[in-house]
Amino acid sequence: MRDLRARCEWDRVQTHQSLRPYLIEEAHEVDDAIAGGDDAVLRDELGDLLLQVLFHSVVAEERGAFGMHDVAGALVAKMHARHPHLYGDGIKRSWESMKAQKTKRSTLEEGLPAGLPSLHRAHRLQDRAAGVGFDWDNALGPLAKVREEIAEVAHHVDAETGAVHDQDALEAELGDLLFAVVNLCRKTGVHGALALDRTNAKFVRRYALMEQLAAADGKSLTTLSLDEQDTYWDRVKAAERAGESRGDGHTRES
């Protein structure tokens, strides 16, 4: 990387700020590779992500801030501090409680990236609160909270017409509902963002199959009524269930 910075004009002019989009993009591509289950692709994408780490380290080194050895050394020290039961005489404690003590956070959200996606942010906030004991005993607590929040959301939607009584209040209640769902995910060992990614992929897959079925009948979804579209949706779900019974495809999902 030092050689590239010296000899390549494009590499030479890059800064931490100009490299930000590439770092974010490479992280997403690693995530896609993991979801795809292809080890060769994952290997290549991890290399691209590592390149970004090296790039930022050399940029920092050039301005006398730190270098790659400093990055690696800080990581080793951090891992030792987080595992005192392995590398010291300390007892095993929760990751969040150790981080809070080490960094002496003054607020719950201190240190969380400003650009962290909302589902990830909710999960991390709840993890941090749990690290100091502010948490449900088990999944029954957040499950009851989800039911409570659904009722509060319904209070702002007219039961006859579906009209919204107070848009701002509804937004607040929907936020509470989403936060409760994330908490339920966390207490059951599911990451809300991954669960939603799975459902997004399922919806895209089923919608594409709907379009194919309609096209095979000489129709377009854009010209069909909702009832007709639902008929194709049900056909897709029935085909998936049939595929599951034969053991040749997707799992059964609603």
Segment roles from a protein language model:
Residues 1-46, 51-174, 178-254:
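Flexible "arm" and connector segments at domain edges
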